[in-house]
C-alpha cells in the first residue's frame, strides 16, 4: 500500500472493510471504482473500463458513474444480488488539508433497498435473519421500507425455507457459525444473497420488549444489528416486532405454493396467471402488499374468518358506498413507505404533499365505513385516526407544487414564518425596483431596445445593442460582458440592488431548508399513528377488493363445518377468468364420512389437475375471508394443504421426476393431519409401471389408514379403482369423455365411478401424429389388452402386489424401462411409412414416456409433428 498515492491508500483502507461490496468512491461529480471492483463493474454495468496512475509502477483499473444518475446503476447491481457501499466526501474539499475525508454513509443490499425501480410498490422488500438454537431455528423478517418486523421459532429448516420463499426475502443474514449445509440450502433453495453478522448489540431497542423469549429477541437482534451497521441512520420507523407461530395459519409448503401458483406462475414466474393476479382489485400499494400476505397465510380461526366475511358481505350489499370507498382509496398514497422515508430523512416536499393529499381522504373514508349497516364495520371506523393535526400542519406549511430539490426555495408558504416573509419582501421589492429600472433606463438613454436581464454567472445586467452604444453616457456604465451584437453593462445602483436581492434569496433558500427540516422532524413524531392508519386503510382496501371480485365474478359466501366438503358447481377461479367468454364447465366435490378420499381417473388433458387445484384454491379463498367460485360451498377449516402436481417438476435442480414425486409425497405423509387437504396427481408415473402402481397403492392405503386427511388422488393406473371395494373411505370419480365419429371429446365433467378406458392414443391424434403411426399404436394396444386379459388376476390389488414382486425378482435380467413398441410384428403394408415418417417413428419409439411429464410429452409430440410438416 505504501507505493500508492494518499487517495488510493484511503480507498484501499475503506475497501478493506467492505470486501463483499462494490465501493462507490466519490470523486467530484462521479462515483469511481478501482482494481477488481472496476473490472467486474465494467462487465456487469457495460461501462468503459479505463485506468489511472495510482503511484505504483502499473496503472490502476478504473471505471465510474455520474453521481446524479447513479441510482440506475446501483439498481442493476442490486438486482444481480450484489451490495453497494456508498462512500461520500464528508468535508469541504476547499477547506481540506491533504486528502478529502471520506467515509461510507450507507451499504445498499438486496434486502435494504429503500426506493427506486428495485422496489415494487405492491410487494414488500423483506430481509430475513436465520439463527440456530438447540432445538429450533429462529427466523426474523424486517422491511425497511414499511417498518414491519416479524419473528418466529421453527423446528425444521424446510419450513424456514418455505417461510422465506413466501415473503420473497432477497437477502438472508446469518452467523458465520451456522452449519455450512444449512447456509448452502438457504442460498440454493431461496435464491437469496447471504450476509453474515456476528456483532453484539450495544443496546436493545424497545421494539422487542413484548417478545418474552430470549431466543426470539436474539434472532431479531442479529437482524437489527446488521441494519444499524449497514444503514448508518435512524431506524425510528421500525414497528414493534410481532411474534407469530406457523400453527396460527394454514400451512402451505414450498412445493404446494409453487404448484398452486398462489402469487406467481410456475413457468414465467410472473404475477399474471396467479391467484394474486386474479384477486388484486386493490386501490393502494399497501393494500396490494397486504393481499399477498393474506394469501400466503390463510386463517384457521373461524371467528377471524367470519369477521372478514361479514364485512365483505356488507360491502357487497352497499354498492354505492363501496364504489365511493374505492375512489377515495385510489387517492391514498403509500403511507407505510412515506413514513419510512420520513424516518430515513430522505423524504422531500413532494412526498409530504402526497401525505397531505392522502390525509384529506381519511375523514370521508371514516364516515363511509361508519355508515355501513354492520357493527363490525362501525367498530373499524371508530379506530380510524384521521391525523387531523398533521393535516393542518402540512396545509399551513407547504406550497401545493413544490420543487423536487430542497435547496432552491419555493417550499414553504407565505405566512408560515415571519422572518421568511421578511426576506421574501426584500427580494420582491428589489425585483420590483429592477423591473422599474428597465423603463427608467430606456427613458434616460432613449434606447427602446435596452433591456435588463439576469443569469447565474454574471448576475443582473443592462444589455444594449452595439448600434446604440454611442447613446450611453460615458462614465455611468461599466462593461461586464461582450456579445456578438451587444454589450452588457452594470451601474453602481444595479450592483447594490443585486447584492441585496441575492442576499435575500440566499437567506430565503437557507431558511426554507431549515424550516423544511424542522417540519420533517415534526412529521417524524406522527410515524406510529401513520403506520396504524396505514394498517386500517390497507385492511379496508383488501376487504373491498374481496367484495368487488366476489360480486363481479358471482362468488358465494362459504359456510364452515367440522368434516364435510360440499362444493356445488365449483370453478377454478383463474382458469375461469382466463377463459373469459368461453363456456367454463363447473364441477362439484363432496367429501365426508365414508368419502374422505376421491380416486380420480380419466384421460390426459381432461381436467383432473384443474379439478384438484380448484378444490385447493376454493379452500384458500374461503380461509382468507373471500367468497368462493361456486353455487354453494360448505368446507372444513384445513390446517395444511399438500400437493404433488407434475407441472412443477424442476429437473434443472438435478432431481428426476420420480425423486421430486417422492420428496413431495414424503412431505405430505410425514406432516399431514386428519384436518389437512392432500392433492396427489399421478403419483408413481416417474418410475416403471409396476413400481409406480405399487407405490401409488401403498400411499393411498397409508393415507387412508394412518392419516385420514381429505385427499384427491388422480391416477392413470386404472387397476387401482378396485380399491374402492377394500377401503371404506375411498370413492372413485372420473372425468367424463366420449367418442364421437372415432374422435374423443373431453367434457371436463366429474362423474361418480371409475373411468372405463384411457384415451392416450386419442391425445396423440390431437397432436396430429401420422395416420400410419396411430394405426400401428392401436394394433399394439389391442395386443397388449388381449395379453393382459389372459393373465388377469382376480383383483387389481393382488395384481399390483404380484407385479411388484415380479419386478423386484427380474430387475437384474431386464432393461430398466421396456418400450411399449417392442414387437416381432412388422408394420403392415397398408400403413407403409415414408423415410421421414419412419425416422419420426424411430424417435417416438425411443422416447421414455414413463419418465416424462405430460407437458414434456406434449412438447415432444409437437416437435415431431413439426418435423413431419
Swiss-Prot record:
GO molecular function annotations of the record: ATP binding; ATP-dependent DNA damage sensor activity; damaged DNA binding; mismatched DNA binding
Keywords: ATP-binding, DNA damage, DNA repair, DNA-binding, Nucleotide-binding
Domain of life: Bacteria
Signal peptide: none
GO CC annotations, alphabetized: cytosol
Ligand binding (ATP): 602-609
PROSITE patterns cross-referenced by the UniProt entry: DNA_MISMATCH_REPAIR_2
GO process terms (BP): mismatch repair
Role summary: This protein is involved in the repair of mismatches in DNA. It is possible that it carries out the mismatch recognition step. This protein has a weak ATPase activity.
Family statement: Belongs to the DNA mismatch repair MutS family.
The protein, known as: DNA mismatch repair protein MutS
Organism: Bacillus licheniformis (strain ATCC 14580 / DSM 13 / JCM 2505 / CCUG 7422 / NBRC 12200 / NCIMB 9375 / NCTC 10341 / NRRL NRS-1264 / Gibson 46)
Amino acid at each position: 500500500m505504501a507505493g500508492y498515492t494518499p487517495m488510493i491508500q484511503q480507498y484501499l483502507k475503506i475497501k478493506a472493510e467492505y470486501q463483499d461490496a462494490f465501493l462507490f468512491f466519490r470523486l467530484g461529480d462521479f462515483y469511481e471504482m478501482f482494481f477488481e471492483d472496476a473490472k467486474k463493474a465494467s462487465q456487469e454495468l457495460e461501462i468503459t473500463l479505463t485506468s489511472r496512475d495510482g503511484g505504483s509502477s502499473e496503472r490502476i483499473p478504473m471505471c465510474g458513474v455520474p453521481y446524479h444518475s447513479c441510482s440506475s446503476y446501483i439498481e442493476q447491481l442490486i438486482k444481480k444480488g450484489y451490495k453497494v457501499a456508498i462512500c461520500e466526501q464528508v468535508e469541504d474539499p476547499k477547506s481540506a488539508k491533504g486528502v478529502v475525508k471520506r467515509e461510507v454513509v450507507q451499504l445498499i443490499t438486496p434486502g435494504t433497498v429503500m426506493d427506486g425501480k428495485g422496489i415494487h410498490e405492491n410487494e414488500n422488500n423483506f430481509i430475513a435473519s436465520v439463527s440456530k438454537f438447540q432445538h429450533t431455528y429462529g427466523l426474523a423478517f424486517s422491511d425497511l421500507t414499511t417498518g414491519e418486523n416479524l419473528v418466529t421459532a421453527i423446528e425444521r429448516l424446510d419450513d424456514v425455507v418455505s417461510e422465506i420463499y413466501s415473503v420473497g426475502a432477497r437477502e438472508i443474514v446469518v452467523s458465520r457459525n451456522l452449519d455450512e449445509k444449512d447456509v448452502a440450502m438457504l442460498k440454493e433453495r431461496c435464491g437469496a444473497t447471504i450476509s453474515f453478522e456476528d456483532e453484539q448489540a450495544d443496546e436493545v431497542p424497545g421494539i422487542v420488549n413484548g417478545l418474552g423469549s430470549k431466543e426470539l429477541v436474539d434472532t431479531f437482534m442479529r437482524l437489527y444489528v446488521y441494519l444499524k451497521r449497514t444503514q448508518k441512520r435512524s431506524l425510528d420507523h421500525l414497528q414493534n416486532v410481532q411474534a407469530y407461530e406457523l400453527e396460527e395459519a394454514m400451512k402451505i409448503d414450498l412445493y404446494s405454493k409453487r404448484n398452486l401458483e398462489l402469487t406467481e406462475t410456475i413457468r414465467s414466474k410472473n404475477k399474471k396467471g396467479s391467484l394474486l393476479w386474479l384477486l388484486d382489485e386493490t386501490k393502494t400499494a399497501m393494500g396490494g402488499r397486504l393481499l399477498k400476505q393474506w394469501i400466503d397465510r390463510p386463517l384457521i380461526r373461524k371467528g377471524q374468518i367470519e369477521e372478514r366475511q361479514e364485512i365483505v358481505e356488507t360491502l357487497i350489499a352497499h354498492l354505492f358506498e363501496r364504489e365511493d370507498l374505492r375512489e377515495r382509496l385510489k387517492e391514498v398514497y403509500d403511507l407505510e413507505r412515506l413514513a419510512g422515508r420520513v424516518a430515513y430523512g430522505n423524504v422531500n416536499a413532494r412526498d409530504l404533499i402526497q401525505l397531505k393529499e392522502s390525509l384529506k381522504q381519511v375523514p370521508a373514508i371514516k364516515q363511509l365505513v361508519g355508515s355501513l349497516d354492520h357493527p363490525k364495520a362501525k367498530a373499524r371506523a371508530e379506530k380510524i385516526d384521521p391525523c387531523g393535526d398533521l393535516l393542518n400542519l402540512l396545509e399551513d406549511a407547504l406550497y401545493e407544487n413544490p420543487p423536487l430539490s430542497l435547496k432552491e426555495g419555493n417550499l414553504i408558504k407565505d405566512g408560515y414564518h415571519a422572518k421568511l416573509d421578511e426576506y421574501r419582501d426584500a427580494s420582491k421589492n428589489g425585483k420590483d425596483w429592477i423591473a422599474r429600472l428597465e423603463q427608467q433606463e430606456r427613458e434616460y438613454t432613449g434606447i427602446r431596445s435596452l433591456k435588463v436581464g439576469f443569469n447565474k454567472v454574471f448576475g443582473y445586467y443592462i444589455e444594449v445593442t452595439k448600434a446604440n452604444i454611442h447613446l450611453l453616457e460615458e462614465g455611468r456604465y461599466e462593461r461586464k460582458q461582450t456579445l456578438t451584437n451587444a454589450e452588457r453593462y452594470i451601474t453602481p445602483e444595479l450592483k447594490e440592488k443585486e447584492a441585496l436581492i441575492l442576499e435575500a434569496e440566499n437567506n430565503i433558500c437557507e431558511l426554507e431548508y431549515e424550516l423544511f427540516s424542522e417540519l420533517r422532524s415534526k412529521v417524524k413524531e406522527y410515524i406510529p399513528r401513520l403506520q396504524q392508519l396505514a394498517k386500517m386503510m390497507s385492511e379496508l382496501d383488501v376487504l373491498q377488493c374481496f367484495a368487488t371480485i366476489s360480486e363481479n365474478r358471482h362468488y358465494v359466501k362459504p359456510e364452515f363445518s367440522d368434516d364435510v366438503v360440499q362444493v356445488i358447481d365449483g370453478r377454478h377461479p383463474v382458469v375461469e377468468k382466463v377463459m373469459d367468454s368461453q363456456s367454463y364447465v363447473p364441477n362439484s366435490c363432496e367429501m365426508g364420512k365414508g368419502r374422505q378420499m376421491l380416486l380420480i381417473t380419466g384421460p390426459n388433458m381432461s381436467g383432473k389437475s384443474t379439478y384438484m387445484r380448484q378444490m385447493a384454491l376454493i379452500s384458500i379463498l374461503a380461509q382468507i375471508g373471500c367468497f368462493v367460485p361456486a353455487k354453494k360451498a360448505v368446507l372444513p377449516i384445513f390446517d395444511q394443504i399438500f400437493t404433488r402436481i407434475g407441472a412443477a417438476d424442476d429437473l434443472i435442480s438435478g432431481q428426476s421426476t420420480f425423486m421430486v414425486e417422492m420428496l413431495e409425497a414424503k412431505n405430505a405423509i410425514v406432516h399431514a393431519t386428519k384436518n389437512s387437504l392432500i392433492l396427489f396427481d399421478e403419483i408413481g408415473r416417474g418410475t416403471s409401471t409396476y413400481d409406480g402402481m405399487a407405490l401409488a397403492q401403498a400411499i393411498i392405503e397409508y393415507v387412508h389408514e394412518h392419516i385420514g386427511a381429505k385427499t384427491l388422488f388422480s391416477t392413470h393406473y386404472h387397476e387401482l379403482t378396485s380399491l374402492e371395494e377394500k377401503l371404506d373411505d375411498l370413492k372413485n370419480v372420473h372425468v367424463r369423455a366420449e367418442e364421437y365419429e372415432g374422435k374423443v371429446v373431453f367434457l371436463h365433467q366429474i362423474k361418480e365411478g371409475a373411468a372405463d378406458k384411457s384415451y392416450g392414443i386419442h391425445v396423440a391424434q390431437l397432436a396430429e401424429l401420422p395416420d400410419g403411426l396411430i394405426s400401428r399404436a392401436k394394433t399394439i394396444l389391442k395386443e397388449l389388452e388381449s395379453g393382459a386379459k389372459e393373465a388377469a388376476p382376480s383383483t387389481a390389488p393382488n395384481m399390483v402386489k404380484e407385479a411388484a414382486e415380479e419386478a423386484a425378482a427380474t430387475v437384474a435380467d431386464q432393461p430398466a424401462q421396456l418400450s411399449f413398441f417392442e414387437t416381432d410384428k412388422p408394420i403392415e403394408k397398408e400403413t407403409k411409412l415414408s423415410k421421414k415418417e419412419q425416422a419420426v417413428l424411430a424417435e417416438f419409439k425411443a422416447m421414455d414416456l414413463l419418465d416424462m411429464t405430460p407437458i414434456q410429452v406434449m412438447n415432444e409430440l409437437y416437435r415431431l409433428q413439426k418435423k413431419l410438416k
